[in-house]
UniProtKB/Swiss-Prot annotation:
Reactions catalysed: D-ribose 5-phosphate + ATP = 5-phospho-alpha-D-ribose 1-diphosphate + AMP + H(+)
MF term (GO), any: ribose phosphate diphosphokinase activity
Binding site for Mg(2+) 2: 178
Descriptive protein name: Ribose-phosphate pyrophosphokinase
Species: Streptomyces avermitilis (strain ATCC 31267 / DSM 46492 / JCM 5070 / NBRC 14893 / NCIMB 12804 / NRRL 8165 / MA-4680)
Function description: Involved in the biosynthesis of the central metabolite phospho-alpha-D-ribosyl-1-pyrophosphate (PRPP) via the transfer of pyrophosphoryl group from ATP to 1-hydroxyl of ribose-5-phosphate (Rib-5-P).
UniProt main location, coarse: cytoplasm
InterPro entries named in the record: PRib_PP_synth_CS (IPR000842), Pribosyltran_N (IPR029099), PRibTrfase_dom (IPR000836), PRTase-like (IPR029057), Rib-P_diPkinase (IPR005946), Rib-P_diPkinase_bac (IPR037515)
Gene that this sequence comes from: prs
Record bears the keyword Magnesium: yes
Length: 324
């Protein structure tokens, strides 16, 4: 049977939605299992049908689905797949969400707004998820939204080690694109033994995806600056931050982010930016128009596979990141 790995009395089965099958196959390969064959299609009116081709009874099931565009469709498919596993008598259901949709809606900025990140967690729990495994949440408090264990994985080791191997560390400055990412940037500084700078920005709450950059805090003149963020969506924030760094005398700018959302005008902005390299992981598929020489995509599959193995074998996911 495909997708089964047995340890003693335990049985692992690995499932994938249709959002990012390449990542699913790579994770399954690292685990030494196959992806369980699944029949999935859309009805004429847009409803989604799912049926697994093998029994999941008594199995520890791991279901991977990244929330890429069209995001609402893939979230709904994931919920349907969770429900199908629950009704198929799965022993446990671990939902792997490399990119957690709606994570930016993690609190009410103003009255009469939803907390959509909490809603996503509630929907997964109601559908039947026992555990969530995700990568670089937009904010840490989202871990508390789900009524069950949440394994929060980090791409920092992959991204930082890649940059550290390419750049003369004596010239390197780690830059946070805003005050909210300073703690993550600090961990980069510790890993690369580099100083920290911050780009101060203000966002117009009434205009989506519009950012005004004001000032750079820290010395970036003549330095190779590494901008670190969790995601890049339209590219407005990060490209404006890069422009501010160049205006303050930076020699070069490299941008790193775990999640390359890359919506709307992102393609043109990244192509036309003075940034020498954009580095992402493959938590999300990269659009074809963004397969550029200046874009590097690193594999997150080993990190996810190692975490899945620890969960299945009742090990420690935390131990995978102790060196941070």
């Amino acid at each position: 049977m495909t997708g089964i790995k047995t340890t003693g009395e335990k049985k692992m089965m690995f499932f994938s939605g249709r959002a990012h099958p390449e990542l699913a196959e790579e994770v399954a390969h690292k685990l030494g299992v196959g992806v369980v064959p699944t029949k999935a299609f859309d009805f004429a009116n847009g409803e989604i049908y799912v049926r697994y081709q093998e029994s999941a009874r008594g199995a520890d099931c791991f279901l991977i689905q990244s929330h890429t565009a069209p995001i609402n469709k893939w979230i709904m498919e994931q919920l349907i797949m969770i429900d199908a596993l629950k009704r198929a008598s799965a022993r446990s259901i671990t939902v792997i969400v490399p990119f957690y949709g709606y994570a930016r809606q993690d609190k009410k900025h103003r009255g009469r707004e939803p907390i959509s990140a909490r809603l996503i967690a509630d929907l997964m729990k109601t559908a039947g998820a026992d555990r969530i495994l995700t990568v670089d949440l937009h904010t840490d408090q989202i871990q508390g939204f789900f009524d069950g264990p949440v394994d929060h994985l980090f791409a920092l080791p992959i991204l930082a080690d890649y940059v550290g191997a390419k750049v003369d560390r004596s010239k390197l400055t780690v830059v946070s694109p805003d005050a909210g990412r300073v703690r993550v940037a600090d961990r980069w500084c510790d890993r690369l033994d580099a100083p920290l700078a911050i780009v101060h920005k203000r966002r117009d709450k009434d205009v989506a995806n519009q950012v005004t950059v004001h000032e750079v805090v820290g010395d970036v003149k003549g330095r190779v600056c590494v901008l670190v963020d969790d995601m890049i969506d339209t590219g407005g924030t990060i490209c404006a931050a890069a422009d501010a760094l160049f205006a303050h005398g930076a020699e070069d700018v490299i941008v790193t982010a775990t999640h390359g959302v890359l919506s709307g005008p992102a393609a043109d902005r990244l192509k036309n930016s003075k940034v020498s390299e954009f580095v992402f992981t493959d938590t999300l598929p990269t659009p074809g128009e963004l397969e550029l020489d200046k874009i590097t995509v690193l594999s997150i599959a080993p990190t996810i596979a190692n975490a899945v193995r620890e969960v299945f074998e009742d090990g420690s996911v935390t131990s995978l990141f102790d060196e941070q």
